[in-house]
Amino acid sequence: MFAVIKAGGKQYKVDRNSVIKIEKIDGELGSKVQFDQILMIGEYSKPSFIGTPIVKGAIVTAEITNQLKDNKIIAFKKKRRKNYRRKAGHRQELTELKILDITKQ
C-alpha cells in the first residue's frame, strides 16, 4: 500500500517501512507523528483513492528516526568589473521519518 502525503508544502510518495527526509518538524527521536493530509492512497494492484483535495479518514503514522541538516547551499551573486560580490550559505534542517502504517477508515 502507498500514499501521497503533504508535509512542509511538498508532496511525498511513501510506502510502509520506507524512510523519507522532510523539512524539520519538532519532536523527540522515537516519537510518533501522524499525517492527516493524504492526497492519494492506494495499492499497486487495485484502483487508488484520489482526494478532493484530501482523502477523508486516511492517516499515515511515522516514527522520527533522526534530526539532521542537509548539505550547504551556496547563493552567490556578483557584478562584473565593479568589485561587487555577495555570498550566502544555507543548511536546511531535516527530519528523517520511517513510515509505520497507512490506514483508511
Curated annotation (Swiss-Prot):
The biological processes this protein is annotated with in GO are: translation
Give me the segments passing through the membrane. none
For this record, the Gene Ontology CC terms, alphabetical, are: cytoplasm; ribonucleoprotein complex; ribosome
Fetch the InterPro entries from UniProt: bL21-like, bL21-like_sf, Ribosomal_bL21, Ribosomal_bL21_CS
User: Which SUPFAM superfamilies does its entry note?
Assistant: L21p-like
NCBIfam families this protein is in? L21
Q: How does it assemble?
A: Part of the 50S ribosomal subunit. Contacts protein L20.
Family under the similarity heading = Belongs to the bacterial ribosomal protein bL21 family.
PANTHER family named in the record? 50S RIBOSOMAL PROTEIN L21 (PTHR21349), LARGE RIBOSOMAL SUBUNIT PROTEIN BL21M (PTHR21349:SF0)
Q: Give the protein's recorded name.
A: Large ribosomal subunit protein bL21
Q: What organism is listed for this UniProt entry?
A: Rickettsia typhi (strain ATCC VR-144 / Wilmington)
Gene symbol of the encoding locus: rplU
